[in-house]
Curated annotation (Swiss-Prot):
It comes from Manis javanica (Malayan pangolin). Glycans are attached at residue 162. Residues 144-173 are annotated as: Disordered. One of its GO terms (biological process) is protein refolding. The modification Deamidated glutamine is found at residues 6, 50. This is Alpha-crystallin A chain. Its main location: cytoplasm. One of its GO terms (cellular component) is cytoplasm. Keywords: Acetylation, Chaperone, Cytoplasm, Eye lens protein, Glycoprotein, Metal-binding, Methylation, Nucleus, Phosphoprotein, Zinc.
């Protein structure tokens, strides 16, 4: 078995380039000691190995894509059901709110809540917006784009979240 040896000076020199989970959206998941004291963990031992970091898309960070034909938002909401999610269009933005009451998990009781707001491009057809939640917890909000001269604005309205039985086909960056 090969064990990589990491010298403490190497990690400290590259400390600003190592990702930290402290400000990521790990809903209900615990922090590791290197999230709070990243430089201290490398001075403990040169043989110390960190846990594996998640990829950017697995970390709950949303992805916004604005192509020529459509506008799409992908958001990882795996801890929420469609009943826990509210999606509203307010003039030129979309608000996604998720909240579930306290429930028991492996480590005790937990309640979660988040609120996200995204600006919609001016040429998105707000009457054709859709929102779906895949089986693996990926929320997909999408709307087609129209030519520039068409009026696309509408008043405030809620977008229903439909449930898909298959995992998300969200492209990874």
């Amino acid at each position: 078995m090969d064990i990589a040896i990491q010298h403490p000076w190497f990690k400290r020199a590259l400390g600003p380039f190592y990702p930290s989970r402290l400000f990521d959206q790990f809903f209900g998941e615990g922090l590791f000691e290197y999230d709070l004291l990243p430089f201290l963990s490398s001075t403990i031992s040169p043989y110390y190995r960190q846990s594996l970091f998640r990829t950017v898309l697995d970390s709950g960070i949303s992805e916004v894509r604005s192509d020529r034909d459509k506008f799409v938002i992908y958001l990882d909401v795996k801890h929420f059901s469609p009943e826990d999610l509210t999606v509203k269009v307010l003039e030129d933005s979309v608000e996604i709110h998720g909240k579930h009451s306290e429930r028991q998990d492996d480590h005790g009781y937990i309640s979660r809540e988040f609120h996200r707001r995204y600006r919609l491009p001016s040429n998105v057809d707000q009457s054709a917006l859709s929102c779906s939640l895949s089986a693996d917890g990926m929320l997909t909000f999408s709307g087609p784009k129209v030519p520039s001269g068409v009026d696309t604005s509408h008043s405030e309205r809620a977008i229903p979240v439909s449930r898909e039985e298959k995992p998300s086909s969200a492209p990874s960056s």
